[in-house]
C-alpha cells in the first residue's frame, strides 16, 4: 500500500493529503468501516455531538472517526474555505485525530443547489468497528477538478471557467482518474466499491456511458447529488466508498 500511512489509534490507514482531510481511508485488518447518515443535515457543532455519542455508544474510541460528508450553504472563496477548515479541524484535534499537520480523516463537503442548509452541516459520517472477517472497506474523499498542489484553485483547475460538454468531459475524466489513483493506493479498484457519488449541477449524460460506466465507476449504480463542489468556480466532484454497513439515524 504505497503512499498510505497507518493510523493505528483508529484502526485504519489513510492517504496523506492536506491539513483539512486525507485522500481516503481503509480499514486495517481486524476492522471494518460503518457509515451512518443523518435523515436531515445537522449543523457542525450539533453534528459532532451526535457523532461523539454514536461512536461512544458503539464502544469505540473517538479516534475511530475516519470520514465525514458535509453540506454547506454555498461555495466558499478560497479564503473562506480555509477559515472554515481551521474551525473544522479543532474538534479533530481534541479527539486525537489531527496533530496540527497531518489529518487522517477522509471528507467530502458539497453545496446543494436546492434546499441548502443554513450553515455547514453533517450529512453522514463513517467510523471503524471491530470485524474479524470483513471484506475490504474504505472511503475515498471527495475530489473536484483541481489538481493537488500549492497554487491557487484557479491555477490548478482543469478547464477553469468552462462548462461546455467537452470541458465537463475533461473535468470528469480527471476526477475519475483521481478516484482510481486513490483506490489504487489501497490496492483497490471500482470492483471493490459499494457506492459512487457525483456532485454537479451540469449535465453528465454526454460522458456518463463512455467515461463513468465504461471505467466501472457505476457498478453499484451512481448517486447524483444536484450540488456544487465547496469552492467557487469548481464544477464537478466525486467520491466513492466500499463499506460493510450503512445506517440512517
Question: What spans do the regions from the language model cover?
Answer:
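Short, polar/acidic, helix-capping and beta-turn segments at strand->helix junctions
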Residues: 1-249
